[in-house]
Amino acid sequence: MDKFTTLEGVAAPLKIINVDTDMIIPKQFLKTIKRTGLGKGLFSEQRYKDDGSENPDFILNKPAYRNAKILVAGDNFGCGSSREHAPWALLDFGIRCVISTSFGDIFYNNCFKNGVLPIRVTQADLDKLFDDAERGANATITIDLGKQEIRGPDGGTVKFDIDPFRKHCLMNGLDDIGLTLEKKASIDSYEDKAKTERAWA
């Protein structure tokens, strides 16, 4: 998992509440267990028309937001069924941070495990970030995880809270496997000791 320390980029404003995981990544894309290639399925029912052509009205199809790294979204983002493919799709598209007032619990947890930072802010702060995001490619936003702040294009800042352990994992690029490998020396020592003291086992 790539480390997350600071992120600077264009933020796409998605002013829709209750975006569920089926909208983020529809069920037909869940057949794979690969984490790559899912970006094409991100919001596919909104990004594409029935004939397969792009919907020019959807935010991520607009020229200013095609390379967005941050998503500013309406309340209760990521609600609905459990599917780890949702953060995989966001990440594969290039989005590493989602900002909203609230998230579906399972989606929220899955984001941290896959290198995507979900940030909760107040409605007032979200409205300000929507305004910043609507300025497009001329107004980048910076996420500073170390300082736990969002810096807008005009220098204004929004502070956010994050669990210290999750912050540690993101800043050091540690997923579940990485966390286990951090304890490799202790695990090896335990196993060597067990072989000596419990040779019969």
UniProtKB/Swiss-Prot annotation:
Listed GO MF terms: 3-isopropylmalate dehydratase activity
InterPro entries associated with the record: 3-IsopropMal_deHydase_ssu (IPR004431), Aconitase/3IPM_dehydase_swvl (IPR015928), AconitaseA/IPMdHydase_ssu_swvl (IPR000573), IPMI_Swivel (IPR033940), LeuD (IPR050075)
GO CC terms in record: 3-isopropylmalate dehydratase complex
Reaction(s) the record says it catalyses: (2R,3S)-3-isopropylmalate = (2S)-2-isopropylmalate
Membrane spanning residue stretches: none
Enzyme class, broadest EC rank: lyase
Alphabetically ordered keywords of this record: Amino-acid biosynthesis, Branched-chain amino acid biosynthesis, Leucine biosynthesis, Lyase
One Pfam entry name: Aconitase_C
Single biological process term from Gene Ontology: L-leucine biosynthetic process
EC number: 4.2.1.33
Pathway: Amino-acid biosynthesis; L-leucine biosynthesis; L-leucine from 3-methyl-2-oxobutanoate: step 2/4
PANTHER family: 3-ISOPROPYLMALATE DEHYDRATASE SMALL SUBUNIT, 3-ISOPROPYLMALATE DEHYDRATASE SMALL SUBUNIT 2-RELATED-RELATED
Oligomeric form and interacting partners: Heterodimer of LeuC and LeuD.
Similarity-based family: Belongs to the LeuD family. LeuD type 1 subfamily.
Function (record text): Catalyzes the isomerization between 2-isopropylmalate and 3-isopropylmalate, via the formation of 2-isopropylmaleate.
Official protein name in the record: 3-isopropylmalate dehydratase small subunit
